[in-house]
């Protein structure tokens, strides 16, 4: 290098490492309506100040890297950088902080959940200066929301398609989840739908295995639901899982489902990926298919309180990517889910405008600007004794899904479906009459048993079954 070049470089660019907080911690910054806002739970390594940790998150998830680079001078970092604009300690937790970060909208590709997550959570979670990091919530600005199609149809359109109003929808996951032949699988589907359920479902890991190839399953399930429809006069559906090893194969399965004339298909959106999910959601809107979403693998990401991504963020991402149903926990069943937290993200799925409410874990006000809503699905370890609580907790705009709670009935699949339908109708009628489901739930179910032997048998089988474990992911002390 010539002396002349050295002089010019030293004037325009100073190499070396500097603290992130000098550039990316900006407590005086006023957030813009177009910013994506993030709330991170940050646990710094010993000796790392919280301001430096928060700034590091902002830097590494936007324009920064570990050292100064001369190409910084070729762009406007002030325009494009993420900013940590506020930090607060977490009450009752040692060395944990909530760091609020604002990202300029120009950092993100329009209509791409994949790109949004690649930026915000793609690399920073392995950063050595942090012991742990969790993305608690995102505020998606309306300008960005409007770049997404969202759910293929939404709650009201689904009800109109099914001609079912004024109650939760009822479903059942076919069990055993693996090992049945396609014909026996279709038989179970028919019996459950004939007994009074609205939907039956492929389990999340039912794809196209040697014991039951996808095309055979689709054909037998279509035959089952058409037969049940003809006999009951109700529109029925089975969630045909289109998840596959490639996007091309996934779309081939969705096209075949449409050709069969069935109303709904299914996708495992986390294992399948957001790009595949958005592709399928667009196809479903264009071709009149409803889309059921399973959240398989979510607990790997969201269950630990100090590290990962909270499910409320994954729920928002799903609403943007597209899905008409998504599993959302039960509060009362076998799967993780504290009541206030669950109801917080249920509102984020269904409602058009949700106010900030830290008592339910909602860090930001969210405006969906008329994007269709998503039906939450309660599924996992629930049975007829849970029906009053589920109806009271989730309300009409939900899907209550009983797998073992249908197929485990001592008299068979169809009586199991009858028991669930009778229990639901009894709870809805009692609620509409002004009775308190939370206080009188067991009494309401016992009264219904008097005129439904199927329900009475189910109540006897599951009268002692409870899943009483403390939730791992709980709300912070405010």
UniProtKB/Swiss-Prot annotation:
One Gene Ontology CC term in the entry: chloroplast
Enzyme Commission number(s): 4.1.1.39
Catalytic activity: 2 (2R)-3-phosphoglycerate + 2 H(+) = D-ribulose 1,5-bisphosphate + CO2 + H2O; D-ribulose 1,5-bisphosphate + O2 = 2-phosphoglycolate + (2R)-3-phosphoglycerate + 2 H(+)
Domain of life: Eukaryota
Binding positions (substrate): 123, 173, 177, 295, 327, 379
Any one GO MF annotation of this record: magnesium ion binding
Assembly: Heterohexadecamer of 8 large chains and 8 small chains; disulfide-linked. The disulfide link is formed within the large subunit homodimers.
HAMAP family: RuBisCO_L_type1
UniProt name for this protein: Ribulose bisphosphate carboxylase large chain
Organism encoding this protein: Drimys granadensis
Gene coding for it: rbcL
